[in-house]
């Protein structure tokens, strides 16, 4: 008899629910959120597992890879689709969510999402880490500009390289302000240095990636945009055609139609926000 599994994942524990093809609950248990513990439950009895569902999330890629490597029919479900399916429950709990996911697997009411390869996950981590350091450095610079303006000290137009020297010049006659500014300048300097380290790693990856080099022949597309696109698409064969890529990035319009009303709205903004931001910058550069 076919069986279906729902996994409701949290940081420490995962709720597991196994149902048969008639929807009857066979087993419910909580285990540690570790591949070994989950595999032990799923392989403890010789059940014919048809589908194993888990919600897309921070830990789903790790668990999905481990279960797939073990030869289990695991499926990662799109978050918003799962939320809509489970919202009919009156009482929300990890146990009920796992039971709901198992029933979704049984009736086929789910929308699978692509789980990125390990290489793409590493590229993505490099890109987000670089973006984080860049954002924090800019936050410090903007904060210094704003706070010094309160004292009539205007930074003006100055580049990244000469920014620190300009700040020191402004506070030279204000020792109390200089004492406050100094830690911020040190923090900014360290952030900029480590940002450079990550950017050099990014350039090294792009330099040895044929697809990225080909993408960079497009006007406006630099190494950051190219690697972001490469990491987001991951496996091109998962798209039926080139138009599907735009829809996956949330760049297609939304439609709201009911009776005589038929409205075309703005873009859906589904999918990767970072990718849309990069494409926007590339289009305007």
Outline where the language-model segments fall.
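A detector of single, family-specific signature residues
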Residues: 1-285
């Amino acid at each position: 008899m076919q069986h279906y599994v729902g996994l409701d994942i949290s940081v420490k524990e995962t709720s597991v629910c196994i149902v048969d093809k008639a929807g009857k609950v066979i087993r419910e248990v909580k285990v540690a959120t570790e591949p070994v513990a989950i595999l032990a439950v799923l392989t403890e009895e010789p059940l014919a597992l048809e589908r194993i569902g888990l919600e897309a999330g921070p830990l789903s890629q790790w668990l999905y890879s481990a279960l797939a490597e073990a030869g289990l029919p695991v499926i990662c479900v799109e978050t918003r689709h799962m939320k809509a399916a489970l919202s009919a429950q009156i009482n929300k709990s990890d146990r009920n969510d796992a039971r709901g996911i198992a029933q979704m697997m049984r009736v086929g009411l789910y929308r699978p999402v692509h789980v990125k390869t390990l290489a793409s996950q590493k590229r993505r981590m490099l890109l987000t880490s670089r973006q984080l350091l860049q954002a924090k450095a800019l936050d410090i610079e903007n904060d210094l500009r704003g706070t010094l303006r309160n004292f009539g000290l205007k930074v003006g137009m100055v580049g990244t390289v000469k920014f620190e020297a300009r700040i020191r010049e402004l506070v030279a006659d204000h020792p109390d302000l200089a004492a406050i500014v100094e830690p911020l300048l040190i923090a900014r300097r360290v952030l900029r240095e480590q940002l450079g380290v990550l950017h050099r790693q990014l350039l090294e990856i792009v330099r040895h990636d044929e697809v990225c080099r080909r993408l960079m022949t497009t006007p406006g597309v630099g190494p950051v945009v190219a690697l972001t696109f490469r990491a987001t698409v991951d496996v091109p064969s998962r798209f039926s055609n080139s138009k599907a890529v735009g829809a996956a990035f949330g760049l297609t319009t939304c439609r709201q139609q009911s009776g005589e009303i038929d409205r075309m709205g703005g873009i859906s903004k589904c999918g990767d926000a970072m990718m849309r931001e990069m494409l926007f910058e590339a289009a305007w550069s």
